[in-house]
Amino acid sequence: TVSVVAGSTVSSSVGSPAAFPADCNGETTAVYDVGNNKTVIFWMGASNAGKCVVATVASNNTVSVGSVVEFEDGSVDSDIAATYHAAAGKIVVVFRDNGNSGYAKARVGTVSGTSISFGTVVTFYNGDSSRKANVVYSSAAEKVVVVYSNDSTSDGFSKVGTVSGTDISFGSQATFESGAVGGNEIGMAYDSNADRVILSYRDQNNSGYGTAIVGTISGTSISFGTKAVFKSATTSGLSSVYDSVAQKVLLSYLSTGTEAIVGTVSGTSITFGASATVKSSGTGTASTVYD
């Protein structure tokens, strides 16, 4: 189960804010590069170009940012996802290219100092992908897993990606849901203890219920177990994170309010405890992070 603690005041010193590019047209996505001790921030900029910047946190808690780099000069969607590939020491970013029929694409980024450079753009889905593309890293397989859906059919798909140098290639496509992926988000978390990928989404064929499914990586392929309902009501704003100490997955979502629930993975299945209400009302997107 999960419980909600009372809010607390941040006791550590807070540094001064850093100037950030003003052309952000949507949400930002940040990913931490462990090897370089840097944070890369992605966003949709002017003319809907995909942009990013490398941020450095100093010992006195001040933040500095490098020069803006475009990873896609066409037209991206505001929902950009990224993860850190620990074995390769690279950043993998996935996005929807609205300037190319909504295809789902990926690039490998290399951080050097206060800048980042990218390898060749790779299309991993040449169909009308929705805004649900997401990505996680599997430390056991040393692969990334991407998920996405078709904007017209609402089919949900997944692929395993292999990073080599500054390039990425993908294995065969697996379907985790047929004609039922609703909303604008697919939550993803990697359970390092079970070596499993957990997806959470809104099942349009089942009254919009919050649903989760467990994926197993084998080589360059992924397969899925039986889906499980974690909320018998319409959900949205899905997000998830893995707690390495408790060895559990925490899902957050919006229903009548903002809620959270803990999942336990066993084999190719997942079970859930009782949910907790974080906020009784409100709309938007829930977000989770492990401290």
Predicted regions: what they are:
Residues T1-D291:
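Extracellular, repeat-based ectodomains that mediate carbohydrate processing or recognition
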